[in-house]
């Protein structure tokens, strides 16, 4: 009996030990903040998520800007976008909620707070690289707040990452002035360390990540919105008068205009949100397919408003030799979505070259 009891006791001890270990294991898709920020790769991963969430903001940017301003319209007026078009938007509608922008802000806040702590854990994470990462975080936060303040004027001002339930989730709105001052302060802080890069490895990264040029442009745009025109001109001149070899420059040859649309990331570009449908299925939300007015009303897509379509026709007539605004097969009359590509999608946003007016971009890159 004593022998049996000893065996049972040992078995129980093993079970309790296993149970304790099992309870300490975190879910595979969850990590606590203290366990995450260990290396430079962790910082890069959060920054990448910030850019990814910024790409997810594009449909909101179109809805709040082009759609609300009647540059584009939607034929189905019963949808959330249709209600925005009819000035019938409600706070409960996902199409008018700002949560995706605050996801970008949250990623940026996390990098700003925790990236400096990584230097104590990763000997290869030098201060220069950390400061470079901070400039990108400042840019992402500033750009997100600029979109928010231009559309809502007063929004909650969040500068700390949400890491636990102790953080408040019902924050009062801050004034437009406070938001704009934060953006300008962020840009100044990013530029003060001289860590903002002029280029990254690869064209897509140079145009798709925050560079010194993107920070100048963000500051100029923010000052313009704040009606601080002299400072706006100052930062615009930093771009226009730059002499660095890899600076953004106006195209010297008019015939190169198409490079801005395909393949994109041209020398004239300062910052572009990157899409890669081929390798990463990132085409969702891309604004590449916008139909002209008169397109089949059964499609679930944007179309240019009638005045915008007429303006495109006028420009096409005036500059026919340049074919700047030509659509597929020279038609401005939209047809059913089912017949794509034999329809009137604006060619320069979906074509593949100036000379070849029948080549179609089959992906939304």
Spans of features found by a protein language model:
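Bacterial Sec-dependent N-terminal signal peptides
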Residues: 1-28
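Membrane-proximal, proline-rich intrinsically disordered regions
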Residues: 19-66, 236, 256-258
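Short, surface-exposed recognition loops and adjoining beta-strand edges that mediate ligand/DNA contacts
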Residues: 34, 60-78, 158-160, 196-290
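Conserved, well-structured interaction surfaces
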Residues: 39-48, 52, 56, 77-152, ...
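Elongated scaffold/linker segments in the mid-to-C-terminal portions of large proteins
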Residues: 41, 47, 80-88, 92-95, ...
